[in-house]
Amino acid sequence: CLLNINIEKEWFDTYECEGETISFMSAIMVKILHLYAINTKMTFEMDNEKLKISFLYEDKREKIFELPLIDIDKDILDSQPIEGSVEFQISTKSLDKYISEMLLFGDSMEFICYKDNLFMKSSGDEGNYTLKIPYEVLDELIMEEDLQLKTRVSLKYLYYLTKSHNVFKHLQLKIEADVPFHVVIEEEHFKLQYYIAPKISDDEDNDESFQDFDEDHYENYENQVV
């Protein structure tokens, strides 16, 4: 997967930079950010080839961290815009619920567009779970006419992102066959783009069949999503 975050200078209370590029271990940064509390003032600054991070809490406690900078020899991948055959916006909390349910049955998910309907499906040794997504839970939807699309993606990478539902209320998915899932979270002065490579299925016949998603398959019951 590829994560690209663009933060404009207006997003910060104060911002001074001379165009530097720095690299550090993201795993260490995640551990530090777990110590953040609401209304804490955070400061990032360069100090003698180290990234210095300070937290000033409401009770006047102060924590200071220093991260060593590293050199990255690998080429930095640049994100590319993707125009999906289907694009929709959904509540991050709702998608988190669906992804958590899918993980009960497998570690990957099929996303299917068929006859103007959207489906999510997870399969495993203990059975299958198919969810028909009602349009009512979508804030926006753009779909090509007569689209038939089926693609598979790892659930864990989506799960990492949807756990941010307390911070980001909505996200947008742009989906096209045989290209990475493109997830976008965009707010004022802030844009996050997340690319997840599709998984290749070993069952070619299953990939080509849409019969399980015909309306007749659902005529005996209603699939309701809260």
Predicted regions and their residues:
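DNA polymerase sliding clamps and clamp-related checkpoint/processivity subunits
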Residues: 1-104, 110-226
